Amino acid sequence: MRRWLRLLVGLGCCWVTLAHAGNPYEDDDYYYYREDEPRQHGEPNYVAPPARQFRFPPLNNVSSYQASCVVKDGVLDAVWRVQGTFYPEKGIVARVGWSGRRGRKWGRLHAPECLVETTEAVFRLRQWVPTDLDHLTLHLVPCTKCKPMWCQPRYHIRYFSYGNSVDNLRRLHYEYRHLELGVVIAICMAMVLLLGYVLARTVYRVSSAYYLRWHACVPQKCEKSLC
């Protein structure tokens, strides 16, 4: 019993720690801000500030990238600048994917315009985007000589629909995610406890029946043995 209590207390502490961990992207440039322009057709415009230069381990000759994004009247204007080593004569494959509603919806946008040099590649995309857009991902393979592994310079727009504010987005992306995690942990714990209860009850019944059958002194059994 003490072990179960310790386990429950430990899981509760972990959940509280995750819930109060805060927003890991608080100081990140991923967050967009709202323009001080008048709304058109009742829909606000969104502009994503230029992303900082992100670095990650070399993969398919890509070293770093920068990204910027503007969503205005439902039209996306995005630019990716990817630094690395490229072979323009061999060509390059680039696709832009999107997802929304916390991963429940996804799709692919048009192929971006590519300007490839030996040390830098620029990808531009201008297209209408869904209103429940969550984030964009630029998938690219720098050259055909490289192994067929996808490089994914990501740029998160963090933008669900025109009516949501930044506070609502943070709540949807983080607080609600922690709440979902807590609910999942609680359901798993309840299932484990229920399974343990059923198993313990089954073992108790089987052992009781075995004991009564072979070891307990039942009146009929005792009378027969005395005869």
Swiss-Prot record:
Principal localisation: host cell
Assigned GO CC terms: host cell endoplasmic reticulum membrane; host cell Golgi membrane; membrane
Topology relative to the membrane: Single-pass type I membrane protein
InterPro entries: CMV_US
Transcription in keyword set: no
Compartmental location: Host endoplasmic reticulum membrane; Host Golgi apparatus membrane
Gene Ontology annotations of biological process type: symbiont-mediated perturbation of host defense response
Intervals, Cytoplasmic compartment: 200-227
Disulfide bond entries: 69-151
Family: Belongs to the cytomegalovirus US6 family.
Protein name according to UniProt: Unique short US8 glycoprotein
